[in-house]
């Protein structure tokens, strides 16, 4: 446990390093900490913090910079988030961006607003598309071509174009959709397929043909996997900590290209409530030491369905980014639940 003097100096060092990006020396600490300490005393405290693994001294400078362990102590115990006025401004921007519409478009808008507000990369893990349907509708496009409209319980609307062996009249399409909605709504299409096998003798041939075509179109083309949406990757090219080294830059864009590590990290963070901070060099889930990820889960009707966050440098203004992530998650949950 650090004494108050050491806490103040560590907090000042990290705040100055985040603001300026340069190793912080004793003169800067004396100026900004508000403590009446001699340079020698400050150097002694810095030496103690270095022994504790909270700061390090780069070879090229007499100043010090925080370690991942130092950042962790800072965000867990010393961080002061932005003022209520700043949070109100964030809330207004997010509310304006997350307009009612199709869930997939709302989620994509969340990734965009995270990027725009943080000036880093915004990321959203979308919910798995439901195997279950709430309602379907058939619409005749032309001879032997029908548009199948599927509405999921989450409000997602999916369209499939079906090619059939014969033509169907509008009244036949309405009759078929009414029958399916009355008897099968709330089931997965695999369950519908099994039920059709059992009930095939009770249905007319044209009805059976149409239902089988709908089930086949839905299960063949359904995308049930989780998707990572990323917005603002290019913002990170402006961050020297991440882009100044070519090998590091290549690794960064491998993360965005492969997305495997991001999926794992976002999946882990979906199992805990509230904002979580993953710091590179400290968490094995963050593949680059100079990178941090701030995440929060979002919900639909009280059930966690995905995760969103901001990807940026370890040297980010956490006091600004944390409210952005928290507010966006809460407003995304509200918008999706009102659909």
Swiss-Prot record:
GO terms for molecular function: DNA binding. Keywords: Repressor, Stress response, Transcription, Transcription regulation. GO terms for biological process: negative regulation of DNA-templated transcription. Gene3D superfamilies: 3.30.450.40, Heat-inducible transcription repressor hrca homolog, domain 3, Winged helix-like DNA-binding domain superfamily/Winged helix DNA-binding domain. It comes from the Bacteria. SUPFAM superfamilies: GAF domain-like (SSF55781), Winged helix' DNA-binding domain (SSF46785). NCBIfam families: hrcA. Negative regulator of class I heat shock genes (grpE-dnaK-dnaJ and groELS operons). Prevents heat-shock induction of these operons. Belongs to the HrcA family. This is Heat-inducible transcription repressor HrcA. It comes from Paraburkholderia xenovorans (strain LB400).
């Amino acid at each position: 446990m650090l004494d108050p003097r050491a806490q103040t100096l560590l907090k000042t060092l990290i705040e100055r390093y985040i603001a300026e990006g340069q190793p912080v020396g004793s003169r800067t600490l004396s100026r900004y900490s508000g403590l009446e300490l001699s340079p020698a005393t400050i150097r002694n405290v810095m030496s103690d913090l270095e022994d504790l693994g909270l700061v390090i001294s780069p070879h090229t400078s007499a100043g010090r910079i925080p370690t991942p362990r130092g950042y962790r102590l800072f965000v867990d115990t010393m961080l002061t988030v932005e003022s209520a006025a700043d949070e109100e401004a964030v809330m207004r921007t997010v509310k304006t961006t997350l307009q009612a519409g199709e869930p997939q478009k709302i989620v994509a808008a969340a990734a965009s607003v995270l990027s725009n507000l943080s000036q880093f990369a915004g990321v959203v893990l979308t919910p798995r598309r439901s195997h279950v349907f709430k309602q379907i509708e058939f619409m005749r496009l032309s001879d032997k071509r029908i548009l199948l409209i599927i509405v999921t319980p989450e409000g997602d609307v999916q369209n499939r174009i079906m090619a059939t062996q014969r033509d169907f009249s509008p009244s036949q399409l309405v009759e078929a959709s009414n029958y399916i909605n009355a008897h099968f709504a709330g089931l997965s299409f695999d369950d519908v397929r099994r039920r059709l096998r059992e009930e095939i003798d009770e249905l007319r041939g044209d009805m059976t043909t149409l239902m089988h075509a709908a089930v086949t179109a839905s299960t063949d083309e359904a995308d049930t996997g989780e998707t990572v949406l990323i917005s603002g990757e290019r913002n990170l090219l402006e961050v020297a900590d991440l882009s100044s080294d070519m090998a590091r830059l290549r690794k960064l864009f491998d993360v965005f290209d492969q997305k495997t590590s991001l999926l794992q990290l976002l999946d882990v963070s979906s199992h805990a409530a509230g904002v979580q901070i993953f710091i590179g060099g400290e968490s094995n889930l963050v593949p680059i030491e100079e990178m941090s990820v701030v995440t929060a889960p979002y919900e639909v009707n009280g059930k966690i369905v995905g995760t969103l966050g901001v990807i940026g440098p370890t040297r980010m203004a956490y006091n600004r980014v944390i409210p952005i992530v928290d507010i966006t998650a809460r407003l995304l949950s509200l918008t999706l639940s009102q659909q």
